[in-house]
């Protein structure tokens, strides 16, 4: 089976959506994937409609889609991967915690995927609950910020992540903010000036290592001003 391309899906999501509402989308459209590109484009149209639609309608449409997919194991795997790319991937314009949570609820309940295959979806759903815009900021080892703070999350074993320390620090938009670098994984501890450093052992329970380098901005009142954003 052809593997799902996050890059292709993101391009498709940005291209626009078809006319019509989302609630009846999968009653009007097939889940056929014999033409993989057409199926991917069709799902991209659905994802754009879903994130813009009333939540009740979007969730109802998700149920219709999953009910169809339960009769097609190969399609279930394929569409589950597309949902991961559309509703979880940071670069996707359709990243959405509610819709991703709905997808994970169905994936774990429907019994098509094996329990061990559901685990990555469950972990991503948990990661997605942290540091959403307007919610309480959370970094292991920090009770609260005492000033507006730029938090950069990086993989200590990733050269690109280490490069982000210098690139982000040099950006004038962050002048005047406290700067906290949260290092995850294994590797030499960075020493780029201008940053406070934190290396929490439990960091990967909160942050997706594969998503780094990312940053978010926390306010002195303990809330998230700007959610996760690619640092480079």
Q: Would you name each region that the model predicts?
A:
Residues 141-170, 178-183:
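Short active-site neighborhood of thiol/selenol oxidoreductases, capturing the structured segment around
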Residues 4-14:
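Sec-dependent N-terminal signal peptides
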Residues 211-232:
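Non-catalytic, surface beta->alpha helical segment in thiol-disulfide oxidoreductase systems
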Residues 206-210:
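Short loop/turn motifs at secondary-structure junctions and domain boundaries
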Residues 17-141:
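Oxidative protein folding and maturation machinery
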Residues 176-202:
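Thiol-based oxidoreductase modules, predominantly thioredoxin-like and allied folds used
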Residues 152-157, 181-184, 199-201, 219, ...:
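Active-site proximal loops enriched in glycine and acidic residues that flank catalytic Cys/His/Asp
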């Amino acid at each position: 089976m052809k593997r799902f391309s996050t890059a292709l899906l993101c391009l498709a999501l940005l291209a626009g959506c078809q006319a019509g509402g989302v609630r009846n989308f999968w009653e009007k459209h097939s889940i056929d994937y014999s033409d993989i590109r057409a199926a991917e484009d069709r799902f991209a149209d659905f994802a754009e409609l879903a994130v813009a639609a009333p939540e009740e309608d979007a969730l109802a449409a998700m149920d219709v889609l999953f009910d169809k997919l339960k009769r097609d194991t190969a399609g279930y795997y394929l569409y589950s991967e597309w949902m991961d790319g559309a509703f979880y991937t940071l670069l996707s314009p359709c990243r959405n915690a509610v819709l991703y949570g709905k997808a994970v609820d169905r994936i774990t309940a429907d019994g098509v995927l094996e329990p061990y295959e559901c685990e990555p979806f469950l972990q991503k759903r948990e990661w997605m609950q942290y540091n959403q815009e307007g919610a309480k900021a959370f970094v292991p080892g920090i009770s609260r910020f005492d000033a507006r703070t730029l938090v950069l999350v990086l993989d200590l074993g990733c050269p690109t992540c280490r490069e982000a320390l210098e690139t982000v620090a040099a950006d004038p938009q962050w002048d005047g903010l406290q700067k906290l670098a949260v290092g995850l994984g294994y590797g030499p501890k960075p020493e780029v000036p201008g940053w406070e450093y934190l290396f929490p052992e439990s960091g990967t329970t909160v942050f997706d290592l594969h998503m780094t380098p990312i940053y978010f901005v926390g306010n002195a009142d303990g809330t998230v001003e700007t959610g996760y954003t690619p640092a480079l």
